[in-house]
Regions:
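Bacterial signal peptide processing site
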Residues: 22-24
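A structural signal for leucine-rich repeat
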Residues: 563-568
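Consensus positions within tandem repeat domains that build extended binding/scaffold surfaces
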Residues: 85-87, 107-110, 130-133, 153-156, ...
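Sec-dependent signal peptide recognition
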Residues: 2-10
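Post-signal peptide N-terminal segment of mature Sec-exported envelope proteins
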Residues: 28-48
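C-terminal motif of bacterial Sec signal peptides marking the signal peptidase cleavage site
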Residues: 17-20
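Structural signature of tandem-repeat unit edges
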Residues: 42-53, 64-82, 92-105, 115-128, ...
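Lipid-handling modules and contact-site tethers
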Residues: 224
Length: 580
């Protein structure tokens, strides 16, 4: 046992040797010059020797009582290359720090909450400033950054409320989330000739964003980066030529009426135009290589989006909840439709998937308005909820290479009656396995001639019964056909569910039942005309039809009162009922 303990102690000494520059054994060493002696006297800091790199890391304040802290270039002829995480966290004595020329990185929280720190001078060797490195240094007025710095991580200078200006070197490639967040006095930021990758809220709550004299027609640029758009800007946003980066959240919640992106732009950041509900169309130039997550999320008026094949990086949620979107495409360089890309795009009735798409991500097309989907043979994976709640979906193919259908992939696709299965996956009528793909089937591989488009209506025939499945037109006022091929038909469940165009409808004589969810969430429906042949109105047939005010019934009040109306149809019951 004693030998084991001794071995562990020996290993600890070899790989993590902590020393204090002022220790007696070090003072006993022969010094050959006054410079070395002075350096030794100054270096009361706590250090750790890095055996692998033959260098030292500063790990703490040690015995130092200096207000003007100087971190030496080296110790014991080995360079000091790093300041460790939390090394000087909360050291209230420090008023300034000058960091030695060999230090390459400053760790997380290294100088966080140093309340008296006014000046920080970093050498050219520093390439990275860690998360919260100077977080909440309220007295910090001046920071000198070296010429080789590559990255300033999240919240590095957050809440440095006295900092008025900062020069970001040409070498800087990335600023993390909230890097200068709540630097209330920061009014001047200079940058080099290239755009800097930016996280979220980098300069939020700074004086720079409030100084409107630096804005150009409601737009603030930082070098080649579009940093911010005034939320009150209502005219067209024409991004100036030469801009290469649109920063995260740059135009979030704006009222801009149109958008023009120049061919110099290479990247559109996270949520850049999210919730900008005045944009109706967007054309992305072929200079753009990256579109980050949620870039156009919840742009409720956006109808068309044209994406170039130059896009190679495409985030999740890009068009989520763009409820007016009717046309979009997938760039050919992508082999995946990322998760939630078109989730909630309730006007999107079709999309072309290029050969090369392998994966349909989770919720990628959930709550769209597809009637038919054709998947290319390249598709191998349908992730969870990929087509969930496509109430209009009637027909889809499962290509030969598909090996996975995720859970609930087709759940709530109540009208999915036609599945052409070329894969090795087993699909059963009424089955809930493999993403519920077979749950609402009446038969496998519907034969030709049983699913027929007649005019603007789609019909399906099964066991001698004709069903009206869906309306494929765009008219706001619709009259259903009297018959199908001269024969009677029934309305299938969810016939018009979630229609965004329907305002008036006339149901012909002979229809006996208004089925479940027939007009569910038809929020524009104001008036309906029903025949006296209707005897049943099923559950949620008029659920969320909030605009419905008038029901014309071609029969007597007694006939209307005899209809079996499910109690979930209160909006129908409370409308004005007009009888003969």
């Amino acid at each position: 046992m004693k030998k084991a303990i001794a071995l562990i102690l020996a290993l600890l000494l070899c790989f993590s040797l902590f020393i204090s520059c002022g220790k007696k054994e070090e003072e006993a060493e022969t010094q050959e010059s006054d410079t070395e002696t002075e350096a030794s006297d100054e270096c009361a800091l706590e250090l750790r020797k890095e055996i692998a790199t033959s260098s030292y890391t500063v790990t703490g304040i040690g015995k130092s009582t200096d207000a003007e802290l100087v971190i030496p270039d080296s110790y014991n002829d080995l360079p000091i290359t790093k300041i460790d995480d939390k090394a000087f966290w909360g050291c209230s004595q420090i008023t300034s720090v000058k960091i030695g020329k060999n230090v390459e990185s400053i760790g997380a929280n290294a100088f966080a909450e140093c309340s008296a720190l006014k000046r920080a001078e970093l050498p050219d060797a520093v390439m990275k400033i860690g998360e919260r490195a100077f977080f909440s240094c309220p007295s910090l007025e001046s920071v000198t950054l070296g010429s080789k710095i590559r990255k300033i991580e999240a919240s590095a200078f957050e809440k440095c409320k006295a900092l008025k200006s900062v020069a970001l070197p040409e070498s800087l490639a990335a600023l993390g989330n909230s890097a200068f967040f709540e630097c209330e006095s920061l009014e001047s930021v200079t940058v080099g000739d290239k755009a800097i990758e930016m996280g979220i809220s980098v300069f939020d709550k700074t004086a720079m964003l409030k100084a409107k004299d630096k804005w150009e027609n409601g737009v603030l640029y930082l070098g080649k980066t579009l940093l911010k758009v005034d939320t009150e800007k209502t005219d067209e946003l024409v991004i100036k030529d030469g801009t290469t980066l649109i920063a995260p959240f740059a135009a979030v919640d704006t009222k801009i009426s149109a958008l023009t992106i120049p061919s110099s732009v290479e990247k559109i950041g996270n949520s850049a135009f999210a919730n900008s509900d005045g944009i109706t169309a967007v054309t992305i130039p072929d200079s753009v290589k990256t579109i980050d997550a949620s870039a156009f999320a919840s742009c409720s008026a956006l109808k068309t989006a044209t994406l170039p094949d130059s896009v190679r990086s495409f985030g999740s949620h890009v068009f989520i909840h763009c409820t007016a979107l009717t046309s979009a495409n997938i760039p050919k360089a992508l082999n995946e439709v990322p998760q939630h890309t078109f989730n909630g795009c309730s006007s999107l009735k079709s999309i072309e998937l290029h050969p090369g798409i392998r994966t349909i991500g989770a919720y990628a097309f959930s709550r769209c308005a597809f009637t038919q989907v054709t998947l290319p043979d390249s598709v191998t994976t349908l992730e969870t909820h990929a087509f969930h709640s496509n109430y209009s979906l009637i027909s889809i193919n499962i290509p030969k290479n598909v090996s996975k259908i995720g859970t609930y992939c087709f759940d709530h696709c109540y009208k999915l009656v036609d599945v052409k299965n070329a894969s090795g996956i087993s699909i059963t009528v009424g089955g809930t396995e493999n993403g519920h793909v077979g749950r609402f089937l009446k038969e496998l591989n519907v034969p030709e001639g049983k699913l027929v488009k007649e005019g603007d209506f789609l019909f399906y025939t099964f066991e001698g019964v004709n069903y009206l499945m869906s309306y494929l037109g765009e008219s706001a006022s619709v009259t259903l056909p009297d018959s199908y091929k001269g024969e009677a038909y029934e309305m299938y469940r969810d016939t018009f569910s979630s229609s965004r165009t329907l305002t008036q409808i006339t149901v012909p004589n002979g229809i006996k039942k208004i089925p479940t969810n027939a007009f569910k969430e038809c929020k524009g429906l104001t008036e309906i005309t029903l025949p006296n042949t209707v005897t049943t109105i099923d559950a949620n047939a008029f659920n969320a039809c909030t605009a419905l005010v008038k029901v014309n019934f071609n029969g007597t009040k007694a006939e209307f009162d005899a209809i079996k109306i499910n109690s979930t149809n209160s909006l129908f019951i409370n409308a004005e009922i007009i009888t003969n």
